[in-house]
């Protein structure tokens, strides 16, 4: 009897210790919330006395429901992910290519059969905040519901009202092709239990209305962390390295913390505002890839006071260093001085296809948007962004019209693209890259339509 009692106590004790360890592990992996760094006190929206940081820009407070919904839909950048290349806007079909398969974005037009036309208000909120579809199935976090969960109910329903005002598009989309066990949607219930806070935005009472507005825009609507914050072991955002930069579908989303060496710390407020609004900041480069799309479809359509609020918030994010990257460029080369790892092939391609626009010094005479010196991509020793721009080209919308760089993906081989990319980083960047043909082939796979 004594032995039995001891065994029972041992089992109970072990279970308690195990539970504590498990809870501790979950707490550690989950990490801090997105605004924990501010160290202030979160309060209910109704209890924040300085105003309402949610909703639309202060300049649009008298706008109609549909006008507010359109503004918020654009701020949330919905069109980029829910529009396939060459497809109808919001009709879905955009492919997310992952190491374990491909998934496709959904049709969010109000079509009754293939879209969201049957969604009630509560079902729409469940999808936005909890990642749960109308049929009860779990959404994958390619839909950034762990960020959208902070969007207020009123704003989410304004987005729904705008989407439901659009013309329904019948679009039968491809089936996801995810490998086991990633194709088991039910398992996302446990992932969400750990990593989705399922809570609406709560202002920080120690911060200004402008800061809180910027936080709401950056964390909830614009979901900046989804690209710019590294992932943890559970593929959720690792806010211990908030905004430190991360790889996204082959591209490198750069450090946007306040770090002076590798982030935005050396940028002026005007630099950041210009980059968000126009996709370019003098001495810092031009937005391409997903960031370019975010500028075109979202940030460029935001009111100036909202851009200013985001700048205020970004300034407050603690510095997080990216060891292999520097925002500091090499001095502009003189004459035809080559980079330290320049190849004959790389120089030949640059001379034939690049120099006429970008210049031998990296200071473009055609447009400041084509200047290479200072560009984050050129200073990235992985050279992935440089290679992807060469492969796919890029296009920027400016107040004076569109400015394009053509795609060279079909004109040059993987070896040639690697050579010219390495030449560019060696000649104009802080550190030479060593991209290989195999690296370029992998990049092609990740961005292929």
Please tell me what each predicted stretch does.
Residues 2-62, 103, 127, 132, ...:
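Post-cleavage N-terminal segment of exported redox proteins
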Residues 58-66, 71, 101, 117-121, ...:
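Solvent-exposed, acidic/flexible segments
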Residues 61-84, 89-97, 190-193, 202-232, ...:
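Sequence/structural segment immediately N-terminal to covalent heme-attachment motifs in c-type
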Residues 71-83, 106-107, 123-130, 141, ...:
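C-type cytochrome heme c attachment motif
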Residues 80, 89, 113-116, 126, ...:
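Short loop/beta submotifs within extracellular cysteine-rich repeat domains
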Residues 88-102, 110-111, 121, 127, ...:
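Signal peptide-directed extracytoplasmic domains
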Residues 90-101, 106-107, 229-280:
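Active-site substrate-binding loop specific to GH73 endo-beta-N-acetylglucosaminidase modules
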Residues 104-118, 129-154, 175-176, 253-264, ...:
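Axial heme c-ligation environment in periplasmic c-type cytochrome domains
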